[in-house]
From Swiss-Prot:
Organism: Dichelobacter nodosus (strain VCS1703A)
Catalytic activity: aldehydo-D-ribose 5-phosphate = D-ribulose 5-phosphate
GO CC annotations, alphabetized: cytosol
Active-site annotation: 103 (proton acceptor)
BP GO terms, sorted: D-ribose metabolic process; pentose-phosphate shunt, non-oxidative branch
Keyword hit for Metal-binding: no
Key words of the record: Isomerase
GO MF entries: ribose-5-phosphate isomerase activity
Record protein name field: Ribose-5-phosphate isomerase A
Subunit structure comment from the entry: Homodimer.
Recorded metabolic or biological pathway in which this protein acts: Carbohydrate degradation; pentose phosphate pathway; D-ribose 5-phosphate from D-ribulose 5-phosphate (non-oxidative stage): step 1/1
Length: 218
């Protein structure tokens, strides 16, 4: 089973965990786009929907859903999103699509966070995928120098501007053995908007599609 089919399978499977008539938070990324398509096919109805990226908002609206601002509705009952990496402790690396700040805001506001992945995203140790750090543009060089002091290698993702109007540094070789402390440390650097370590607000449930066709919940 190829990766696209695995994404579609887990996106359909999570519908069993998402009741109608709730406030739903929707993340971003390729697996989430499959989830939006599954919502459309199932003709689900929700009280409100909030989205973590402009891309997801447009996909939801194209599927017939009305997207609300987080300030204009109740906190999400459930937030569904993917991950670039996730470990057994449900700590994630996110931000490959540059939507990490809005993803973390909605995840933090939500009562329950369900992460949907295919088996390629499950790792024994975090860090193979670089950690995205959203920065205010004028602070890029300063933040990069501070990150070097942490023993890591920041690289500017040139040409990418986030939905918030900021830039992204992709941080390689970051020591994530104490991911929660590293998340807090990076977020104390002046000019950092948010980082893509999701340790303080990790997933509550994970649904993973395997190449044998099974869906694993943990």
């Amino acid at each position: 089973m190829n990766q696209q089919l695995l994404k579609e399978k887990v996106a359909a499977a999570v519908l069993e965990h998402v009741p109608e008539n709730i406030t739903l938070g929707v993340g971003s990324g390729s697996t989430v786009l499959c989830f939006i398509e599954a919502l459309k096919q199932a003709k689900r109805q929700f009280r409100d929907i909030v989205a973590a990226s402009e891309t997801s908002s447009k996909a939801l609206e194209a599927a017939g859903f009305r997207v609300r601002d987080l300030n204009a509705c109740d906190p999400p009952d459930i937030y569904v999103d993917g991950a670039d990496e996730i470990n057994d402790d449900k700590i994630m690396i996110k931000g490959g699509g540059a939507a990490l700040t809005r993803e973390k805001i909605i995840a933090s506001a939500a009562k329950e966070f369900i992460c949907i992945i295919d088996e390629s995203k499950k790792v024994a140790q975090l860090g193979r995928f670089p950690v995205a750090v959203e920065v205010i543009p004028m602070a890029r060089s300063y933040v990069a120098r501070e990150i070097v002091k942490l023993g890591a290698e920041p690289r500017w993702r040139q040409g990418v501007v986030t939905d918030n109007g900021h830039w992204i540094l992709d941080v390689h070789y970051l020591d994530l053995t104490a991911a929660e402390r590293m998340e807090a440390r990076i977020n104390t650097i002046a000019g950092v908007v948010e980082c893509g370590i999701f340790a303080q607000r990790r997933a509550d449930k994970v649904l993973m599609s395997q190449s044998d066709g099974e869906i694993v919940l943990w």
